[in-house]
């Protein structure tokens, strides 16, 4: 009954429910989990979104298309998609992950979305998988516009400082917590002529640096 409700939310009925069950299974819960599906789904998602952007923005150059795609397939965006389906309610997690609130964690939710995309592909083929991606992303694709906002925070901050002939920011990892497979990074960002030290957090060093750069952008009012 639970999977029936989820399939209605997804807008897709599986011929082989085993694919969906595996897509919902985190590595903490079973050896037959969604990691391989996530790997496959990531490729399908990138292709589907890339094709949609290529068709929607015929005048966009390669860099602009890449930045827009990155914004749509990043962890935070996938987590938004996951919450639309309330995926956390359907996932199978180990006791430790459940206790620590893994069903709310963006990294776990985003991986699950990618795994479900792969599950649809294995169940019904590439056309059906791409159709579901386009449906789930329809509003996000409609809202997508060319422009500065598609550049990641580090790039925007760097270009802002370079345009004013100021030194580039310095990033430093100040803390790492958690096991090797589930780490949280804390990074500081320092900008010359700004007294404040900005702190960012993320599941990788790169994500933490992006988060720190975003804090700088907000304070400096960079558009």
Curated annotation (Swiss-Prot):
Cofactor: Mg(2+)
One GO molecular-function entry: rRNA binding
Name of the protein: Ribonuclease 3
Binding site residues for Mg(2+): 38, 111, 114
Oligomeric and partner information: Homodimer.
GO annotation, biological process: mRNA processing; regulation of gene expression; rRNA processing; tRNA processing
Disulfides per UniProt: none
SMART domains in the cross-refs: DSRM (SM00358), RIBOc (SM00535)
